[in-house]
Amino acid sequence: WAASSQGGLTMHRGSGKIQLENGQVGSVGLYRFDPNDPRRAALKNVLLFYADFGFQLGFELDGKPFETFFSGAPNDGMRLWVDRDKNGVRSSKRETVIVGKPFNFTGTTYVLKVTEGVVALETSETELPVTPLPPNLVVGKNAIPFAMESLSGEKIDFPKGYEGKVVMLDFWATWCGPCIAEIPNVKAAYDRWHDEGFEVIGISFDREGMADKVKEFVTKREMPWPQLYEGKFWSTSLGEQYDVSSIPFVLLIDGSTGEILATREKLRGPGLADFIGEVLSKR
């Protein structure tokens, strides 16, 4: 065991061995808070362990096989990812099952329940509509078309109105720190490559009644590309269509074909301008 002190309180960490089946021995990390810590009075006589183990769970929904994985012991409220479309991209809205709550992926409403540490699948008494599959927004697939009016009154018809262009859809908000941190990188790419066919469309996740603030923000930050704003926060229609659950969320799209050319892995950071140049050079 090792002790570490901070702020007059001491925490102990150690490890132990567990006898497993078939004569195997496992190791588990343990820790204990200072029994004099007033913030954790309920844990003063409790020895805790790190959940450094997990389980793979396979099950069938209406005869179709699915699987998921979770770490530690199962419990009600645990969120499990089920890769419904097998593309390896996680959708927190359309591919998540919460243990103890009903869900419908295939036509029948089910519920996962935990009884004495065992997870079981049951048919739910509550009937829900089928959760639609998430859009397959991976490189090589097509983006979702849309038509909206920008904050400045410009009619945006995407991708139809961007023939011959390379377009970056930028889902962001004025309250989003990581989004703001990316603005200099987007500006650098736009300033460098706009005349060569690079376009940006901003989709704001700002709240209701903030249209003037968004206009003021983009003017002050010198962001000349069109901005789409509905004032619906996380329920903005394009966010729902594109299954956006975190921002910044970005996609690079061929305006002529609608094909997705790159996702966030290539579209963030100071290397954005160079990457856009590479894409344009191959057209």
Language model: regions and residue ranges:
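Short active-site neighborhood of thiol/selenol oxidoreductases, capturing the structured segment around
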Residues: 157-177, 186
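Short, small/polar residue-rich loop motifs at catalytic or cofactor-binding pockets
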Residues: 142, 165, 245-247
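Calcium-binding acidic motifs and repeat modules
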Residues: 1-149, 156-162
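Thiol/disulfide oxidoreductase modules built on the thioredoxin-like
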Residues: 221-223, 230-277
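Active-site acidic short loop of glycosyltransferases
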Residues: 163-164, 195, 223, 244
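Structural microenvironment flanking redox-active thiols in thiol-disulfide oxidoreductases
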Residues: 181-221, 231-240, 274
